[in-house]
Amino acid sequence: RGRFALVQLPERFAESMQLALKYGLQPKRLQWVHSKIDKPAWIFLMEMQKGGSYGLDVLPPLIMYNQDGSYTEQVKKFYEPAVK
């Protein structure tokens, strides 16, 4: 089964869900991304599966920056080597 990853603005969330279902894509994972913990989400990440079963896993929000402007530990992990 094919998978599709989407990065989109929050104001397009409802439209994205409608189109996914219209074309047989079942949302599987969703994560909201915030620049800082006290700021609203500026994008969302969604993984969909063609013809997949029902069930959406809503992941904890991804916070990009600490209050001092440095990357959060969560984001730093993306830049660590995969093999040590």
Predicted regions and their residues:
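Conserved Class I SAM-dependent methyltransferase catalytic core
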Residues: R1-H34, K39-A41, L45-M46
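SAM/dcSAM-binding transferase cores
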Residues: A41-K84
